[in-house]
Amino acid sequence: MSTNPKPTFRRILLKLSGEALMGDEGFGIDPKVLDRMAQEVKELVELGIQVGVVIGGGNLFRGEGLAKAGMNRVVGDHMGMLATVMNGLAMRDALHRAYVNARLMSAIPLKGVCDDYNWAEAISLLKSGRVVIFAAGTGNPFCTTDSAACLRGIEIEAEVVLKGTKVDGVYSDDPMKNPDAVKYDELSYSEILEKELKVMDLAAFTMARDHDMPILVFNMNKPGALRRVIMGEEEGTLIRAKKVI
Protein backbone atom coordinates (compact mmCIF):
# COMPACT_ATOMS: atom_id res chain seq x y z
CA MET A 1 0.00 0.00 0.00
CA SER A 2 1.39 3.38 -1.02
CA THR A 3 1.92 5.97 1.70
CA ASN A 4 2.82 8.80 -0.62
CA PRO A 5 2.75 11.97 1.52
CA LYS A 6 2.23 14.26 -1.48
CA PRO A 7 -0.99 14.42 -3.51
CA THR A 8 -0.85 12.74 -6.93
CA PHE A 9 -3.03 15.40 -8.57
CA ARG A 10 -2.87 19.19 -8.46
CA ARG A 11 -6.15 20.09 -10.19
CA ILE A 12 -9.14 17.77 -10.44
CA LEU A 13 -12.70 17.71 -11.75
CA LEU A 14 -14.96 15.83 -9.33
CA LYS A 15 -18.14 14.41 -10.88
CA LEU A 16 -20.87 13.46 -8.42
CA SER A 17 -24.15 11.86 -9.39
CA GLY A 18 -27.30 13.49 -8.08
CA GLU A 19 -28.24 10.10 -6.65
CA ALA A 20 -25.13 10.22 -4.44
CA LEU A 21 -26.69 13.16 -2.56
CA MET A 22 -29.83 11.17 -1.72
CA GLY A 23 -28.12 8.90 0.79
CA ASP A 24 -30.65 6.28 1.85
CA GLU A 25 -33.55 8.50 0.88
CA GLY A 26 -35.41 7.81 -2.35
CA PHE A 27 -35.45 11.45 -3.43
CA GLY A 28 -33.92 14.83 -2.73
CA ILE A 29 -30.83 15.70 -0.70
CA ASP A 30 -29.70 14.05 2.54
CA PRO A 31 -28.13 16.88 4.61
CA LYS A 32 -25.77 14.45 6.37
CA VAL A 33 -24.41 13.15 3.05
CA LEU A 34 -24.08 16.69 1.70
CA ASP A 35 -22.12 17.84 4.75
CA ARG A 36 -19.84 14.77 4.65
CA MET A 37 -19.05 15.42 0.98
CA ALA A 38 -18.33 19.08 1.74
CA GLN A 39 -15.91 18.00 4.49
CA GLU A 40 -14.14 15.61 2.09
CA VAL A 41 -13.77 18.39 -0.48
CA LYS A 42 -12.47 20.67 2.29
CA GLU A 43 -9.72 18.12 3.03
CA LEU A 44 -8.56 18.37 -0.58
CA VAL A 45 -8.53 22.17 -0.50
CA GLU A 46 -6.43 22.03 2.67
CA LEU A 47 -3.96 19.79 0.79
CA GLY A 48 -3.64 22.53 -1.84
CA ILE A 49 -5.70 20.72 -4.50
CA GLN A 50 -7.65 22.86 -6.98
CA VAL A 51 -11.17 21.41 -7.16
CA GLY A 52 -13.85 21.79 -9.83
CA VAL A 53 -17.17 20.00 -9.22
CA VAL A 54 -19.97 18.86 -11.53
CA ILE A 55 -23.11 17.39 -9.93
CA GLY A 56 -25.88 15.51 -11.71
CA GLY A 57 -29.57 16.14 -11.09
CA GLY A 58 -31.08 12.66 -10.94
CA ASN A 59 -32.02 12.97 -7.26
CA LEU A 60 -34.42 15.82 -8.11
CA PHE A 61 -35.54 15.20 -11.67
CA ARG A 62 -35.45 12.37 -14.18
CA GLY A 63 -36.57 13.31 -17.67
CA GLU A 64 -36.71 9.83 -19.24
CA GLY A 65 -40.08 8.88 -17.79
CA LEU A 66 -41.70 12.15 -18.80
CA ALA A 67 -40.14 11.92 -22.27
CA LYS A 68 -41.71 8.48 -22.70
CA ALA A 69 -45.03 9.99 -21.60
CA GLY A 70 -44.78 12.56 -24.38
CA MET A 71 -42.83 15.50 -22.93
CA ASN A 72 -40.48 17.20 -25.37
CA ARG A 73 -36.91 16.00 -24.72
CA VAL A 74 -35.51 19.54 -24.88
CA VAL A 75 -37.94 20.69 -22.18
CA GLY A 76 -37.07 17.68 -20.03
CA ASP A 77 -33.35 18.33 -20.40
CA HIS A 78 -33.80 22.00 -19.46
CA MET A 79 -35.61 20.86 -16.30
CA GLY A 80 -32.74 18.47 -15.58
CA MET A 81 -30.22 21.29 -15.97
CA LEU A 82 -32.13 23.36 -13.41
CA ALA A 83 -32.05 20.37 -11.03
CA THR A 84 -28.23 20.43 -11.22
CA VAL A 85 -28.32 24.13 -10.30
CA MET A 86 -30.38 23.27 -7.20
CA ASN A 87 -27.82 20.63 -6.21
CA GLY A 88 -25.03 23.13 -6.90
CA LEU A 89 -26.65 25.70 -4.61
CA ALA A 90 -26.90 23.07 -1.87
CA MET A 91 -23.24 22.08 -2.28
CA ARG A 92 -22.06 25.70 -2.34
CA ASP A 93 -23.97 26.36 0.88
CA ALA A 94 -22.54 23.22 2.53
CA LEU A 95 -19.00 24.27 1.54
CA HIS A 96 -19.56 27.79 2.88
CA ARG A 97 -20.79 26.32 6.18
CA ALA A 98 -17.56 24.27 6.26
CA TYR A 99 -15.61 27.53 5.77
CA VAL A 100 -14.58 26.68 2.21
CA ASN A 101 -14.65 29.43 -0.42
CA ALA A 102 -16.82 28.20 -3.30
CA ARG A 103 -18.38 29.70 -6.41
CA LEU A 104 -21.28 28.34 -8.44
CA MET A 105 -21.20 28.87 -12.20
CA SER A 106 -24.13 27.98 -14.42
CA ALA A 107 -24.07 27.27 -18.15
CA ILE A 108 -27.55 28.87 -18.23
CA PRO A 109 -27.67 32.53 -17.08
CA LEU A 110 -29.52 32.79 -13.75
CA LYS A 111 -29.01 36.37 -12.65
CA GLY A 112 -29.12 36.85 -8.91
CA VAL A 113 -28.83 33.11 -8.24
CA CYS A 114 -25.32 32.21 -9.38
CA ASP A 115 -22.57 33.37 -11.74
CA ASP A 116 -22.60 32.73 -15.48
CA TYR A 117 -20.00 30.20 -16.60
CA ASN A 118 -16.81 31.97 -17.61
CA TRP A 119 -13.77 29.86 -18.48
CA ALA A 120 -11.08 32.45 -17.69
CA GLU A 121 -12.71 33.39 -14.38
CA ALA A 122 -13.07 29.72 -13.41
CA ILE A 123 -9.33 29.16 -13.95
CA SER A 124 -8.52 32.28 -11.91
CA LEU A 125 -10.78 31.15 -9.05
CA LEU A 126 -9.25 27.67 -9.00
CA LYS A 127 -5.75 29.13 -8.88
CA SER A 128 -6.77 31.28 -5.90
CA GLY A 129 -7.91 28.18 -3.97
CA ARG A 130 -11.66 28.45 -4.46
CA VAL A 131 -13.81 25.43 -5.25
CA VAL A 132 -15.75 26.02 -8.48
CA ILE A 133 -19.06 24.19 -8.95
CA PHE A 134 -20.18 23.94 -12.57
CA ALA A 135 -23.98 23.65 -12.92
CA ALA A 136 -26.56 23.31 -15.72
CA GLY A 137 -24.51 20.73 -17.59
CA THR A 138 -23.12 22.02 -20.88
CA GLY A 139 -26.12 24.32 -21.29
CA ASN A 140 -27.33 22.18 -24.19
CA PRO A 141 -30.01 19.49 -24.33
CA PHE A 142 -29.06 15.93 -25.33
CA CYS A 143 -25.83 16.24 -23.31
CA THR A 144 -25.36 14.35 -20.05
CA THR A 145 -23.70 15.68 -16.92
CA ASP A 146 -20.92 13.14 -17.59
CA SER A 147 -20.32 15.02 -20.86
CA ALA A 148 -20.33 18.27 -18.88
CA ALA A 149 -17.79 16.83 -16.43
CA CYS A 150 -15.41 15.77 -19.21
CA LEU A 151 -15.88 19.08 -21.06
CA ARG A 152 -15.24 21.22 -17.97
CA GLY A 153 -12.35 18.96 -16.96
CA ILE A 154 -10.71 19.47 -20.35
CA GLU A 155 -11.42 23.22 -20.32
CA ILE A 156 -9.90 23.82 -16.88
CA GLU A 157 -6.97 21.52 -17.73
CA ALA A 158 -7.70 19.17 -14.85
CA GLU A 159 -5.31 16.26 -14.52
CA VAL A 160 -8.12 13.76 -13.99
CA VAL A 161 -11.92 13.44 -13.91
CA LEU A 162 -12.87 11.70 -10.66
CA LYS A 163 -16.24 10.00 -11.07
CA GLY A 164 -17.82 9.34 -7.68
CA THR A 165 -20.30 6.46 -7.87
CA LYS A 166 -22.00 3.91 -5.62
CA VAL A 167 -19.45 1.16 -6.38
CA ASP A 168 -15.71 1.19 -5.73
CA GLY A 169 -14.53 1.01 -9.33
CA VAL A 170 -15.22 -0.60 -12.70
CA TYR A 171 -16.21 -4.28 -12.67
CA SER A 172 -16.46 -6.97 -15.34
CA ASP A 173 -20.19 -7.16 -14.54
CA ASP A 174 -22.67 -5.48 -12.21
CA PRO A 175 -21.32 -6.35 -8.73
CA MET A 176 -24.77 -5.75 -7.21
CA LYS A 177 -26.18 -8.59 -9.36
CA ASN A 178 -23.15 -10.82 -9.95
CA PRO A 179 -21.02 -11.73 -6.89
CA ASP A 180 -18.31 -13.14 -9.20
CA ALA A 181 -17.78 -9.79 -10.96
CA VAL A 182 -14.09 -8.84 -11.06
CA LYS A 183 -12.88 -5.32 -10.22
CA TYR A 184 -10.29 -3.74 -12.50
CA ASP A 185 -7.53 -1.55 -11.02
CA GLU A 186 -6.60 0.03 -14.36
CA LEU A 187 -8.00 -0.06 -17.88
CA SER A 188 -7.21 1.61 -21.19
CA TYR A 189 -9.85 3.52 -23.17
CA SER A 190 -9.83 0.79 -25.84
CA GLU A 191 -10.34 -1.97 -23.24
CA ILE A 192 -13.45 -0.17 -21.95
CA LEU A 193 -14.88 -0.12 -25.48
CA GLU A 194 -13.83 -3.71 -26.29
CA LYS A 195 -15.32 -5.12 -23.09
CA GLU A 196 -18.38 -2.82 -23.43
CA LEU A 197 -17.99 -1.73 -19.80
CA LYS A 198 -20.39 0.93 -18.57
CA VAL A 199 -18.39 3.85 -17.23
CA MET A 200 -20.22 6.82 -18.73
CA ASP A 201 -22.14 7.52 -21.93
CA LEU A 202 -20.21 7.12 -25.18
CA ALA A 203 -20.17 10.83 -26.08
CA ALA A 204 -18.59 11.75 -22.73
CA PHE A 205 -16.16 8.82 -22.78
CA THR A 206 -15.05 9.54 -26.36
CA MET A 207 -14.43 13.19 -25.47
CA ALA A 208 -12.20 12.13 -22.57
CA ARG A 209 -10.34 9.64 -24.77
CA ASP A 210 -9.80 12.11 -27.62
CA HIS A 211 -8.32 14.66 -25.21
CA ASP A 212 -6.32 12.08 -23.22
CA MET A 213 -8.23 12.92 -20.04
CA PRO A 214 -7.82 10.15 -17.43
CA ILE A 215 -10.99 9.03 -15.61
CA LEU A 216 -10.88 7.53 -12.13
CA VAL A 217 -14.02 5.77 -10.92
CA PHE A 218 -14.39 5.34 -7.14
CA ASN A 219 -17.03 4.98 -4.41
CA MET A 220 -17.94 8.43 -3.08
CA ASN A 221 -20.07 6.82 -0.35
CA LYS A 222 -16.96 5.24 1.18
CA PRO A 223 -15.58 7.65 3.80
CA GLY A 224 -12.00 8.69 3.03
CA ALA A 225 -12.00 7.22 -0.49
CA LEU A 226 -11.68 10.63 -2.17
CA ARG A 227 -8.60 11.52 -0.15
CA ARG A 228 -7.07 8.09 -0.82
CA VAL A 229 -7.56 8.60 -4.56
CA ILE A 230 -5.87 12.00 -4.38
CA MET A 231 -2.94 10.58 -2.39
CA GLY A 232 -2.34 7.93 -5.07
CA GLU A 233 -3.38 5.00 -2.90
CA GLU A 234 -5.02 1.90 -4.33
CA GLU A 235 -8.60 3.04 -4.68
CA GLY A 236 -11.06 2.77 -7.56
CA THR A 237 -10.31 2.12 -11.23
CA LEU A 238 -8.08 4.35 -13.36
CA ILE A 239 -8.88 4.64 -17.07
CA ARG A 240 -6.28 6.19 -19.36
CA ALA A 241 -4.39 5.67 -22.61
CA LYS A 242 -2.38 2.46 -22.69
CA LYS A 243 1.21 3.10 -21.68
CA VAL A 244 3.83 2.28 -24.31
CA ILE A 245 6.23 -0.26 -22.82
From Swiss-Prot:
Biological process terms in GO annotation: 'de novo' CTP biosynthetic process; UDP biosynthetic process
Activity regulation, per record: Allosterically activated by GTP. Inhibited by UTP.
Record-level Gene Ontology MF annotations: ATP binding; UMP kinase activity
Presence of the UniProt keyword tRNA processing in the record: no
Enzyme class: transferase
Gene3D superfamilies reported in the protein's UniProt record: Acetylglutamate kinase-like
Alphabetic keyword roster: Allosteric enzyme, ATP-binding, Cytoplasm, Kinase, Nucleotide-binding, Pyrimidine biosynthesis, Transferase
Positions that bind UMP: G57, D77, T138, G139, N140, P141, F142, C143, T144, T145
Record region (Involved in allosteric activation by GTP): 23-28
EC numbers: 2.7.4.22
Residues where ATP binds: K15, L16, S17, G18, G58, R62, T165, Y171, D174
Keyword match ATP-binding: yes
Any one cellular-component term (Gene Ontology): cytosol
Pathway: Pyrimidine metabolism; CTP biosynthesis via de novo pathway; UDP from UMP (UMPK route): step 1/1
Subcellular location: Cytoplasm
Catalytic activity: UMP + ATP = UDP + ADP
Entry's family note: Belongs to the UMP kinase family.
Functional description taken from the UniProt entry: Catalyzes the reversible phosphorylation of UMP to UDP.
NCBIfam families documented for this protein: pyrH_bact (TIGR02075)
Subunit structure and binding partners: Homohexamer.
Protein name per the record: Uridylate kinase
Gene encoding the protein: pyrH
